[in-house]
Each structure stands twice: as structure tokens, then as C-alpha cells.
Design a protein with these regions (language model features):
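Flexible loop/turn connectors
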Residues: 10, 14-108
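An amphipathic, basic-hydrophobic alpha-helix
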Residues: 5-8
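Short beta->alpha junction loops
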Residues: 1-3
């Protein structure tokens, strides 16, 4: 994932419209993107803020702002959805998952 985050950020940097915030699908992609941004001389978070999603240990070590969803709850809901789908009673109702934002050095 880190490589895809790096490559995606490199492509983004080819445009003239650099966003204020780069929200990545997961922490590893965010770490790869941060590498590409820094190679281009951009300062995080001054020039661009970066966030991840997962709440991994690496995000803490890198000072990455991230959204953390507890693994147990995520797994439970995925299994529940799968079992309902197998039983033919799957509904696409909205559900809420408890999430926590860990504000760190990559955002202001």
C-alpha cells in the first residue's frame, strides 16, 4: 500500500491544484504519500495536511493523523453483513461505527 500511496501522490503533484488536505484510504498509503510530498519539498502540514485511516502503530510512530475504528467492531459488522447476505436477508441500512480521530503532527 505504501507504494501505491507514493505513486498516487506523485501523480497528484503533476497537477496545478494541490489540495489543502490529502485523505488517504489507509495509514500505509498516507505514509507513502508523505514520502512523495516531502521529496517534492512540501512541508506537512504547512503546505498540505495528510490523514490516514486505520490507527496503526506505524501511524503513531510517524506522527500521522488517523481515524481509528476498533478491529473487533469492524470485523463483527462485516461478519454480520456476510451472514445476512448468505441468508438472503441482507439489508443496506445505514449503521454507525465508533471511530476515534488521533490528531497528530500531519494536520493543524
Amino acid at each position: 500500500y505504501e507504494k501505491s500511496g507514493y505513486q498516487s501522490a506523485r501523480l497528484m503533484l503533476l497537477s496545478d491544484n494541490i489540495p489543502e488536505v490529502l485523505v488517504c484510504a489507509n495509514d500505509n498509503m498516507a505514509i507513502g504519500a508523505m514520502k512523495a510530498l516531502r521529496q517534492e519539498g512540501l512541508k506537512i502540514p504547512d503546505d498540505i495536511a495528510v490523514t490516514g485511516f486505520d490507527g496503526t502503530e506505524m501511524s503513531e510512530l510517524m506522527g500521522l493523523t488517523t481515524v481509528d475504528i476498533p478491529d473487533y467492531e469492524r470485523g463483527y459488522l462485516a461478519a454480520q453483513f456476510l451472514l445476512q447476505n448468505i441468508a438472503g436477508s441482507c439489508s443496506f441500512d445505514t449503521f454507525k461505527i465508533a471511530a476515534k480521530v488521533h490528531w497528530r503532527k500531519t494536520t493543524r
